[in-house]
């Protein structure tokens, strides 16, 4: 069965964005882009909340065409345009979307159907509200976290309204030159 992997940049104190959604504190660079690029190339499905999906759609489809496109822009744009996208939204309609499916109801059933389909693991990109919903229904299988060397003090938390303990098994860690630490956790359902 396919796994849902939550891919998220977080602050040391567990926030994924500032109080107004700002993400200008996230550290990136070629080292992280290359590492992430290799891993996402192994996936064939991306999962987004509506807000993150719309943000991605505003940039990635044509990012490679810009005269100032970086290596990362070109590679990620190519991946984004070929990957199958699933969007969690109660307000969007999928009538004219290409290579994209909208899940608007029966979240647990629809996600479990998706996980049963043939294919590679499914990456949930950012999307804090969608992540909260999936966590609350015990649908996330792994956490791929990039802990940034900053304490925000307030903002949008990664973990919100958790009803019980979620046991995790640490799979790997990696430290990047910019100070970011990658943590890979598997949800331990035993």
Give the ranges of each region predicted by the language model.
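Enzymes that bind and transform nitrogen-containing heteroaromatic metabolites
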Residues: 1-190
